[in-house]
Amino acid sequence: MFTLAPSILSGDFAYLGEDLKTIKSAGCRWVHVDVMDGNFVPNITIGMPTVAALRKYTDLVLDVHLMIDRPLRYVEAFCKAGADYVTVHVEADTTENNLLALDKIHALGAKAAVSLKPNTPASAVLPFLDKVDMILVMTVEPGFGGQSFLENQMEKLAALRALCAERNPECLLEVDGGVNAQTGA
């Protein structure tokens, strides 16, 4: 089974409300919200006010992907803005701070996730595996939309599926980047 979460980054920012209606009318129940700070990745996108505006406009699951340095500083604000899932990158801070971020996300009633860049091994999730509701695997280099799917990430997904089956069978796996009708099949 899979869930399709279209990325708001692919939308027209002047018409995000209309884009959310289109996503929902197409049968999707999730929307992926990429937050970039210009430091962790070279691009800058949106912040908490946009997430809060999206939350007021839709009941879709807001899957907020923080591609930002030291996300512990901001997870509370994104949860309070209405994120249903908040994803932090294992590479964005220390293990200790990322564990604190996951705990804070859960304490605020949201689901917690970690993400791995393409060059980060599957084993990097081990310190977090018992605390996450989802693991996101970047299938492009994070920072810009429109890139091609990195097929070599399929091995990482298989390794993560095995780890989750053993230690956290309820954990969801998510791929982000280059997903289309061919790569998503």
Residue ranges, per PLM feature:
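Short beta->alpha connector loops at strand-helix junctions that form conserved
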Residues: 89-91, 138-141
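Short glycine-rich, flexible loops that bind phosphorylated cofactors or substrates
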Residues: 95, 121, 143-144
